[in-house]
Amino acid sequence: MIKAYFGAETFTLNKDFAYILVIGTTDVSLIPGLTIAGATPELTHFTPAADAEYVILGKCKSINTIPVSPTGIPTPALLTRASLSFTKSLKIVVNAGSRITPKIPYIDLQGEPGKDIRKQALSIEKVNIIIENGIKLGEELSNEYELIMIGESIPAGTTTAMATLLALGYDAMDKVSSASPDNPKELKRKVVEEALRNLPTDPLQRLAKVSDPVLLGVAGISLGFRGKILLAGGTQMTAAAAIVNEFDKSKLKDIIIGTTKWIVEDKSADMLSLAKQVGVKVLASMLDLSISIHEGIRTYEKGYVKEGVGAGGSTIMAFIRGVSNSTLVRKIDELYSELVGSNNLNT
């Protein structure tokens, strides 16, 4: 139920781990048509906080339903919570810079929400603070764990990831995925091309111009952690790995990306090309949701949502621990049914 790329099968994941969910927002998500990671562009700023609340509590406090797409498809946090129920992992929420903060305990990296990358995403001071505090958190986690899994939640994060990869010199134009089956590549390209005009020469200044708080937070934690790291995400995690590579080229040997089959098989993108360029190994979960009893879950098989909140990495961790596809889908269906029954989901 897991496919390995670039020698990823040699990476050992069958040990105790901590799940770290890094959340943040970027004003890029307010651009109409760019992301479906929220029912409306304005609601995308609530998605990261609500995702975090659902993973930890099984319900949301910041909004009255779990995050859904404009057509009602549920957040991948559902897959993450179901998968992690089969593990004994510690779950930690880290706020790198979210406009809406979750109503649960979390660790704050003292960052700031990302602004529009066409102007200036972050101040250089906040870039340094997010990375430095992320490194410190990674170092502290090293005292208790040999393995961590890092997930992300930031609507429009694939657009900032593409801008970040291009700013760091990678061939990334039109290679990032989308939560929609109809990847808005033309709009993404237009936004990113505008963001990349008059880029400064200094790499940190470039990150401040076009990146987002989550990419920086994930990179910082990864740089500080002394053990093995599973970056649980899609094309965004290739950008996080690229930032790590800017600071410490020796670190990538300890990092692997764990994602979903919907990302690696996405014909509108090329995640594997990005991973190969950066030099990071990839595992893909072959989770099959076509047997789900819920149409909203089966829709994932049509290319909707694809990844987020560490869904791919979490399902990989469940599979490695002997959980079957049918058992995992039953758990996902059970959680979805609970949401429908509690009116914590608009259907």
From Swiss-Prot:
CDD domains named in the record: DMB-PRT_CobT
Molecular function, one GO term: nicotinate-nucleotide-dimethylbenzimidazole phosphoribosyltransferase activity
Family matches, as Pfam families: DBI_PRT
UniProt family annotation: Belongs to the UPF0284 family.
The protein's name in its UniProt record: UPF0284 protein SSO2213
Lineage: Archaea, Thermoproteota, Thermoprotei, Sulfolobales, Sulfolobaceae
